Amino acid sequence: MLNVARYDVFKLSEAVLAGQPARVQRMLDGLQAEGEAEVLVHWALAEDIRALKRVKDAMAAGKPLPMALRENRIWGPRERLFERVLPRLGDATTARLLHAAHVVDGIVKGLKAPDWPADGWQALQRLAMQLCRACMPTPPRPR
């Protein structure tokens, strides 16, 4: 039998970095319905957050963006997404995202965390949406 999964974590990563919340939600729902492992979805999201932090740190140390991206193995469509997102991503936001990824890592492995859903998929959705909002082309206006 062929594996004809409609969604994959790498496309999810691109949708999150592109700041497309509706697409991200649809993909998360699809990955869950297809039985994808929560830890794999978490890995993809956390790896993007860690890569954003590494590239920001390299740029802060004086490295040009193209070199920082290459050293972190970011190329192709992700390279363009990183180039667009990085200037808008502040240090405080990056720190919050790293902490959230750490919390969700525990949740998908069965640990509880205060102020976070106990269900792994709900926690992944929250993490994905936090990252997605940080990557949106224009920040949402407060209501």
List each model region and its residues.
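Small-residue-rich helix-loop
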Residues: 1-97, 136
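Charge-biased C-terminal accessory regions appended to nucleic-acid-, cytoskeletal NTPase
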Residues: 67-143
